[in-house]
Regions:
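Short, mixed-charge, low-aromatic patches
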Residues: 1-4, 47-52, 146-149
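Membrane-interfacial, low-structure loops and terminal tails that flank and connect transmembrane helices
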Residues: 1-2, 222-227
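N-terminal signal-anchor transmembrane alpha helix
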Residues: 2-43
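Small-residue-rich helix-interface/hinge motifs
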Residues: 26-77
Length: 227
């Protein structure tokens, strides 16, 4: 317990609690949780570009998202299927790393790049466009306006939401892979792609990688957020 206390601060715990509360508020929760969906679907899209094509991405009000891609070979399909949950966990880790180093502007620019790429190239449904424009405006505001403490707190909320969602969404897919193995999203897709690895193992893999990134964050001390 003492070792854990040395790795986190009360401020980190406070923002995790805030993230959990915010993501469970009707309507608002779905709106802010979409940031994780954006990262997840962007992960699929970016990896699909290596030997494949991204047709469209749809972002829906219920926080679900769909990336339509085509691939020229098996490996492209395989790595595209893995990329979604991996990107969610990695960007959550990266966000806290930047915040712990007080490098706020690079983090905002990275998040803006995700928004810009999707708005210009892939997202075409009405809600997806609305969400990207509104959230993109927030990032632009953070980039040019606001005190350091305001920017840090806003980014901490976003990073905390990404961390919470990366863990809960991968846990959900783990549960679905056992309860509904034929309707467990990426786990089902990878089971069909690999044929010999069942959805349950992919569900375990997705959850394990999210835990691994969280543990890596603890070891790196990136959750020790100063005032």
């Amino acid at each position: 317990m003492r070792a854990l206390k040395q790795k986190i601060t009360w401020k980190f715990c406070l923002f995790i609690v805030i993230a959990i509360i915010l993501t469970n508020i009707p309507f608002l929760g779905s709106y802010i949780r979409m940031i994780n969906t954006l990262i997840h679907e962007s992960g699929h899209a970016l990896i699909a570009l290596f030997g494949g094509k991204v047709h469209t991405i749809s972002l829906f009000m219920n926080t679900e998202g769909v990336t339509y891609t085509s691939h020229t070979n098996w490996f492209g399909s395989f790595f595209t299927g893995i990329a979604g949950y991996f990107f969610s966990s990695f960007i959550a880790f990266l966000s806290f790393w930047f915040i712990s180093k007080k490098q706020y502007k690079p983090l905002i620019i990275i998040l803006l790049l995700f928004v810009g790429l999707n708005l210009l190239l892939w997202v075409r449904n009405f809600y997806g466009i609305f969400w990207l424009i509104s959230f993109g405006a927030l990032f632009i505001l953070l980039l040019y306006k606001g005190s350091v403490s305001f920017v840090q707190n806003c980014l901490l909320i976003i990073a905390s939401i990404l961390l919470v969602e990366s863990l809960t969404s991968s846990f959900t897919i783990l549960m679905l892979s056992f309860i509904q193995p034929h309707a467990a999203g990426d786990a089902t897709g990878l089971a069909k792609t690999t044929m010999f690895i069942p959805a349950q193992l992919w569900g375990l893999f997705f959850f394990a990688q999210s835990i691994s990134f969280m543990v890596a964050g603890l070891k790196k001390g990136i959750y020790r957020i100063d005032k």
